[in-house]
Structure formats: C-alpha cells, structure tokens
Amino acid sequence: MPQKTSKRFKKALEMVEPGKSYSVVEAAELLGKFPKAKFDESVEIAFKMTIDPRKTDQMIRGTVRLPNGSGKEVKVLVFAKDGEAANAAKEAGAEFVGFEEYIEKVTSGWTGFDVAVATPEAMAEVRKLGRVLGPRGLMPNPKTGTVTDDTAKAVKEVKAGRVEYKLDKGANIQVLAGKVSFTADQIAENANTIIDEIIKAKPSAAKGRYIENCVLSSTMSPVSYTHLTLPTKA
C-alpha cells in the first residue's frame, strides 16, 4: 500500500529545485524555510562514500568539534575506578560516574546515556560490555577521545558539541550538524566544519573520487533532494 505523504512534506518538496546542487549556505537557508514540525528537528549531514568499509585501510572514524555546538543535551557516563578521575568527571558535568555499579547496570541492558567515557584502567571490564554497547555505538574508543585519563576534558568536549563520525557498512557517514532552530549561518558553519574534517580523514589507500554525494537535511525534511556542491578536493 503506498505510503501517505503529509501536506507539510509536500510543501517542503515544492520548495526544492529538482536536480539542483545547493551550496551549504543555500541548503541551510532552505531548511529554515521548510514548514516546521512540532519539535526542534535535528539537522544532519550525510555522505555517500566511494571507499570500501570492508577494507581496514579504508575505514574512517573520528570526532569533530562543532563551532556552534550540536544543540543536543548529551548525557555522559564515565567508567572510572580512580577517585581523582571520577571526581574530575563529576565536576565537568558528567551525569553518571562510577565503575562496578554501572558495569552491572549496562550488563543488564541499561543504556540511559548518549556517550560513554572510560579510563584506560577501566577498559578491561568495559570491553566485556560489547554486546550492549557495540551495536549502539556507545563503546569507548581511543580514536574518539573517549578512552582517556583526562575524563574532565573528554566530558567538557562532548558537552561543548563534539560529535562522532564513522563509516558504516553501507559506506555512509551521518553526522549531527545542529538543530533547525539554529540560524542558517550556524548550520552552514557546522556543516562546513564537518565536510572539512571528512575530507582531511581521507585514507591514503583511497584513490580518485572520495565522496560520491552529500546531503543536508532535517529530521522531517525531504532528505533525498537537498544535495550539496562539494569542494573539488572531495
């Protein structure tokens, strides 16, 4: 049975020029003109890559700090045995800090947090939580700065708008770029920062064209139609 298309979606679709590649600023301005949902929609930038996620030398993963923040309230869990690291994490604003009690909670399936940070000492036990954390992308990782003794720095960076990017099995990368309530300039600045970071992360094994296409969208916008014009180096 054909899926119904809402009037709001149809109206947004009418505002998109078929076949056009938008500059980042144009796309950000367009998102601001779309009919609004009843909530503050997230803005996301999505990349279709030409690299092969099955090859370890073409896998990319990292973090990027958004100049205007992500607009998302992030709940942070810090696994820390050491009192000093735990106290520093609490002072930095982490919602959940501890070790054994949170190992037990997560083992039972609890995932009431958005980002997990762990000290290197704690990782021997945290790794055993892979069944719960892994599928949700919550496992602490040195590449994303979430395995560290400097728990205060990690918490502050996450709270300030550091977001993670990772190539998935379908050779896609999706990154949070802000909220619809942001100004077009704020969204564009965040999006350009992400684009620059993805380009810098190009593996040396990747030859030729690196990014097949790129789309900027909000939660309820016509995602397939707001393609971006990318730098030639992409």
Can you name each region flagged by the protein language model?
Residues 4-17:
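Generic N-terminal amphipathic, Lys/Arg-enriched alpha-helix
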Residues 24-87:
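Translation machinery proteins
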Residues 27, 89, 134, 216:
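Residue-level signature of catalytic and energy-coupling elements of molecular machines
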Residues 39-43, 201-213:
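Flexible, glycine/charged-enriched surface loops at secondary-structure junctions
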Residues 47, 80, 119-120, 177-179, ...:
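Flexible glycine-/small-residue-rich
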Residues 95-199:
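Long, charge-patterned amphipathic alpha-helical coiled-coil/hairpin "stalk" segments used as oligomerization
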Residues 226-232:
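Conserved small/polar residues in nucleotide/adenosyl-binding loops
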